[in-house]
Amino acid sequence: MSQQRVFDSLTSLFSTHPVVFWHDVDAEFATVVDGLQLGGVQLVRLDDTPALRVKLDIERKPDQRWLIYSAKPEPEPTKDWLLDVRMRSKLFRADSSSILLEDLGLTTQGLRQHLKERGKFLRARDRVDRLKRLVLPGDTAADLDRKMLAVLTRADQPELFAMLQRLYAAMVVDGVANLSVEPKAWQDIAANELTPAFWELSQVQLGYADANPTLRDLLLRILVTDFCRGLQGDAPQQLAHFVLPDRTLAAIASVFVGRWRADIAQYGNYNALARAVAKELDLVNLLSGQSAENLVECMTFEDVELRVVQDLKKRIVAGAGANMDVVRSLMARRRDGHWANPLLASANERTRALVACYDALTAAADFFMLKATHTAGFSFANADTAFSQYRDELFRFDQLYRHFHTAADAVEPTGWAVLHELRDTIEGVYSGWFIPQLSIAWAKVMEGPQGLLTHWKLPEVTPQQAFYERKVLPLLDGGVKRVFVLISDAFRFEVAQELVQHTNSKSRFKASLDAMMGVLPSYTALGMAALLPHKTMAYKESTNLDVLVDGHLVATLEQRNEHLKAFGGIGVKAEDLMALGKDKGRELVRDHRLIYIYHDRIDMIGDKQVSETKTFEAAAQSVQELSSVLGFIINSLNGSAVLVTADHGFMYQESALDGSDKSTLDDKPGGTLKAKKRYLLGRDLGTSSKAWSGNTAVTADTTLDGSLDFWVPKGASRFHFAGGARFVHGSAMPQEIVVPVITVRETEAEEAKTKYVNISLLGAVNKVVTNTQRFEFIQTDAVTERMLARSVVVSLRDFSDGDKPISDEPSITFDSTSQLLDERKRSIFLTVLGGAHDPHKRYDLVMRDAVSKVEVLRLPIKVDLAFGNDF
């Protein structure tokens, strides 16, 4: 303390007390005390003056102010001749420890020695200033050490876990962890002689003790403890010695790890450190014998996720559709965890890949479950049954096949081979069973005197060429001011069904799906013409075989525009419409009652050899793009009725084709005018037992004199492979000719509003008596297009302490579509932090939406761990 500060402090004391004692034990100010020049104050050196003399002088001069200075400690009360004077005086301390005690606002004088021992830390003014913001008047020596450690580590809170996060974060550089590095903060802790305090804190709060403790060893202990607590069954012998010994404190370690994982700011650091620890432990080999059930609650290491994926993949391959409910339940729990949580999918490539692994496994499980319901193949009583069965159910084979490959492709950049076996199995079932079986059954309703090729009409199905008459015109005649027709090239039925689900998940949008009987051959020129308003269709005598609509060419957008004028319509490309924006878009459509919008993604990508392998990626993009166009039409252009359809569908397989996929047709027949992979057009083609044949007058209602004969390959075969052959269309398989029609309307009706499922707690759980407590919840509504799934975070919170969490915060997803209540139950375990939890205080079980953080559920609950520990 400076001489000036001593002067100021004494002056302040003398303003309220006539007598001030100063015991300068270290004699720091012995040489300067005479020069203080305190006006009106009599200095008495007690070490040189008898106490009785001092006592008498004070009594004789009651108006005098006295500074009684001594370089000795205060005497014991029984030996203090000036005790009565001291009782009505003020004690002044000028040693650094006393000053710090005062500066920090501490009330315990016994801390002066401790502050002396922490002199190295307290020497820096900035550290003292930061410490002052954390200190409370009643803090103990241990409290001060903990807060000094927080200052040195720059932790957000003066808590061990916050310090550990900062220390371990410093071990990660550019996403790579180095467990041997000594963080700068750790060096500061050692330099300030606080290392023993750190390890004492670790022992008290975690039960960690070691003859030679290190940050690296502590990290291994914490992570292995968390892993083993989640493991069903005994821990591997190689890991048992790492587990923290105290079960209660081990639970606290798990809470820390859970929060660490959930902290989005520390997400990358945790992942890097966990991977480094797993590698050091050789965890991959230790997990080789573990089942998914044993590991389902272990969220510590990424290698666990890969092992679970591997185990579930084997079950799916071996199960062939059996016992998939167990697999689906295990996958749902893992998706709520850390490494494969869809909410974190944007974090990094590996997380996206793990999410994709479960997407692929889910699609595969559903695919094999669907196959298990059709073990005998397919058999259709008639064409109408065949068409409706594909429309209502069998399209799912194509959809799940696409979903699987889309997800599996997203895993490939990692180099993981975990899905390769499953990919081969799916491919074998789809290309070697589903398509051949469907082809055989479909051929039976195609051929013969009563077959589709002869009539090409179904009583309850709209022909594609009647689209305008049966789908558009009734809307216009019914009072709709303006109808938008959105046509996406090669937008097959199963992709359309996905768009409907996506659309119905939005409030104010109501979408319904139907199917039309596509024209045959199922290719762009004929399909696009069929969708336009018209009286007649015919082929023009030309080398291009252009299709005439009411005598007009309609091959280009400009030609279609010209044709649509007669119907108060206009044609525009989807990307051009979107580029116009709201105001110019409204101006474009203002004077028209019919707007045809053309979108091309799937056909543009799939119909080229260099890009056909990206067909499924293009399908997913189409759903997003068409959804955006729909939103623009309804929200910006005030459209109230939109029809989404296609010119044709497509067939696609991931595996390369071989000779068995090629039609046995020796050569194209005489009279052929156009030859493609999936159709031939010409005149007087005759018939062949190796192909389906017919005339467009029957399959597209072209005029008699403007019709052409066609041949299309049976089943899924191709006439040739030139220019790519995985993506094809043109023939008569349901994937090609079951053409979707989506009707989208804007509505404010209550049933058109989307909302999240409701969740309730099951049972009368109103008290927590153990460190780990199970809670069971029920999803009261089944997930539908309008009733949306919900991911939530659950925790126990201290209501009276600012809603501070006192447990871990696991996430759980409620996404069941089952109508059975028992199948909509989900349970979790919450681990309560150690410490004193008052059984009379209010604590709450709190559930919050994982994305919006909106509170979903709050229930009061008692926490009485002492009660539970008695039993």
Predicted regions and their residues:
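Short alpha-helical catalytic segment bearing the HExxH-like zincin motif
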Residues: 486
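Ligand-binding pocket scaffold of soluble enzyme catalytic domains
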Residues: 489
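…; additionally, a secondary subgroup of soluble metalloenzymes is captured
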Residues: 1-483, 492-642, 646-871
